[in-house]
Amino acid sequence: MVGNRHPTHDRRPTSGTTAALADSLTGTSDPAPPRVWVMMGHKAGDNSQILALAEALGWPFEIKRLVYRPTELMTNLLAPRTLLGIVRRRSSPLAPPWPDLIISAGRRNEPPCRWIQARAGKPVRLVHCGRPWAALECFDLVVTTPQYRLPQRDNVLHNLTPLQRVSAARLEEARALWQPKLAHLPRPHVAVMVGGDAGPYVLDAEAAALLGRAASAFAAKAGGSLLVTTSARTPAPAVAALAGALDGPHELFRWGPDAAADNPYFGYLAVADSFIVTCESMSMLAEACSTCKPVYMFDLDTGPQLRWPLLTSLIGEVPATSFARRLRRLRFQPLVYRTAMVTGPRRLTRDTRIIQGQLIAAGRAVWLGQDFPPGPPPVPLDDVARAVTRVKALTATADDHRIAAE
């Protein structure tokens, strides 16, 4: 529910003076946690990151949902601290009591967050996940990943993968729910996480059908089954082609806005023995890698470096790329991406090949059709813990300044 605090109780005293008096009388000191606002955006991957950080901090937090105007890009470029880019009557209220900490992601949220800082009349720490559009100096902390190629700065935390909400407790809960439901399928379970178009990557019917064939062959070779899930970005023609190509024991979850309660995503993460993930989704790759199980990336590129020939050992033939698919390289989104990579400012572009390469170098993933090199399994990711440590250091500094002022 919009504006609800998690958990619902709030241990915050009415004033710092009251809290200090109570502490002096009882001989204890239990400072209230900072007031945290989580600024939800329009991208599932961004929202997953900021919720992961908010939950891991262990403090109560308030979710703010914003509805953006079609003109938000223009107004936000003209006024870096403004609410002109949002529809205020349809958005969560942005009013006192102001937060001590804002966790946000995405270009559209930056002007409202900076507007809050200007209005609050007190220090408000701003933590941004991903790649900011404003200058890095505008943020107290930027939690970023390799594809954005941000410079080394004191207020920039470079992680290997995007923050994700996978935890041991969440996986155990999901396993208890979904393992009985999937017990009829032979093991090993191979989870297939399907994304969609992004940057230079195109998930058309041709690619989806090949993914279905290759994943089916992969599971059959191991004597196992597939646990397949699409996502909000998966085009309908790709879903149909994927479903038609699946062979052998499998479960297919077709994502839909009305199917959230039955979404088996965390269940698949919990019970799967290995993963096949479309390579454009950094969030799904991070979530799969967080399990420390084998992760195989399926290439969706439309360029000459496409890695489909690696699938020959699975499907028994060299996968052909149709002329129509090669033409899709010239579609608007892939063309804009490639043009921006050549002519655009470096800090406003991203190169997902960097994070893919680092996952391979760290022994956490390989391309589908390749074998994992010998060696021990990877150690658990510590990206969320690193971010929590940095944020708590920020707020501790803010508390010291507040106490000194009192």
Located regions from the model:
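Charged active-site motifs of nucleotide-sugar-dependent glycosyltransferases
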Residues: 34-35, 186-191, 225
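Active-site and donor-binding regions of nucleotide-sugar-utilizing enzymes
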Residues: 38-158, 164, 285
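Alpha-helical membrane-targeting segments
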Residues: 66-98, 243, 304-357
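Leloir-type glycosyltransferase catalytic cores
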Residues: 319-406
